[in-house]
């Protein structure tokens, strides 16, 4: 029997779904949403809060503040409520109503940024500017800064990657979505040091500038960035797959038709992994990807036909009723080999 006294103490680490019957390729999906925060962001949130407490930055009366499109905000709302801190989440209109209501139910203040002062930095830049202004005006406010916080990727170095390795000692390729790149860099660094034969494939969404692509409008929160992630070190990554948001929606519905309701970020990584495996896979390949969240918070967007039609058009809406397998082929992009940083001595295999 498991007994806990605080909600962040529980997290299911070792549940995997065999997706071969769904996508027709060998792929195991690591489910990260089985905790009270509902997403993989619980790990980073717990790690960053614990570090801030050890450093004396968080103390009684502190107010945690963070820029988040949703999942990290929920995780921090839960932890702040449990530990007695205030919490301010700074988000933008892509954060869906259900997520905002969930944060508020946990006692958080939610501020939605709608105006962009610098088009080059977009809504994310506007969110961070607002965070800085609030912190400058009130010393109680403590910005954890998930975009630069080393405890973000270290949480996945300590937990996510070893959990995958324990279950798949013969792993060939790992697909990881790229947002702040905390999950990506934590897993990539761990496998580089301990299992360098594992191929690391990053999955990002078209419109994200993380890997140097042009910025464009993105409607699904989670993966992708409007500025280059400070945590990103491309030398740990072997390939990149870019996924259209329409294919994210198709992948989500494809999974839902088999009874698995996952969030938009999961649809993106499954779509990217499916296209890569269709081009490069073998029946004896061992491949794993990570499902960052579940689908309940996307019922009024990704799973809502009117929303899909308004955003992506009639063709995409009609494609959701077709037989599984209509994911378009996202192109794998080889990553350039660049020198490793001084803290790493071995080479990427």
Language model segments and positions:
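PLP-dependent amino-acid enzyme catalytic core
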Residues: 1-349
């Amino acid at each position: 029997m498991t007994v806990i006294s605080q909600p962040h103490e529980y997290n299911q680490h070792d549940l995997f779904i065999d997706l071969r019957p769904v996508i027709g390729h060998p792929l195991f999906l690591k489910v990260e949403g089985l905790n009270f925060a509902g997403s993989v962001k619980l790990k980073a949130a717990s790690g960053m809060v614990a570090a801030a407490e050890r450093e004396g930055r968080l103390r009684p009366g502190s107010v945690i503040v963070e820029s988040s499109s949703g999942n990290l905000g929920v995780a921090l709302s839960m932890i702040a409520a449990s530990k007695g801190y205030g919490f301010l989440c700074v988000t933008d209109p892509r954060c869906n109503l259900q997520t905002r209501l969930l944060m508020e139910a946990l006692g958080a203040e939610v501020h939605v940024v709608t105006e962009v002062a610098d088009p080059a930095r977009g809504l994310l830049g506007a969110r961070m500017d607002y965070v800085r202004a609030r912190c400058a005006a009130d010393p109680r406010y403590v910005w954890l800064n998930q975009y630069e916080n080393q405890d973000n990727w270290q949480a996945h170095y300590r937990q996510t990657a070893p959990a995958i390795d324990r279950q798949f000692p013969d792993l060939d390729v790992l697909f990881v979505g790229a947002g702040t790149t905390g999950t990506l860099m934590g897993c990539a660094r761990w496998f580089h040091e301990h299992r360098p034969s594992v191929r690391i494939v990053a999955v990002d969404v078209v419109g994200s500038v993380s890997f140097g692509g042009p910025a464009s409008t993105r409607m699904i929160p989670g993966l992708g960035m409007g500025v280059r992630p400070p945590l990103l070190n491309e030398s740990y990554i072997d390939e990149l797959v870019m996924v259209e948001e329409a294919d994210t929606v198709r992948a989500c519905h494809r999974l839902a038709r088999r009874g698995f309701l996952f969030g938009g970020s999961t649809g993106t990584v499954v779509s990217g992994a499916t296209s890569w495996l269709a081009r490069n896979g073998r029946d004896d390949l061992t491949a794993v990807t990570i499902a960052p969240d579940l689908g309940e918070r996307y019922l009024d967007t990704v799973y809502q036909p009117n929303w899909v039609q308004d955003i992506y058009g009639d063709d995409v809406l009609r494609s959701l009723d077709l037989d599984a397998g209509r994911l378009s082929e996202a192109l794998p992009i080889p990553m350039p080999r660049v020198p490793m940083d001084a803290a790493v001595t071995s080479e990427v295999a």
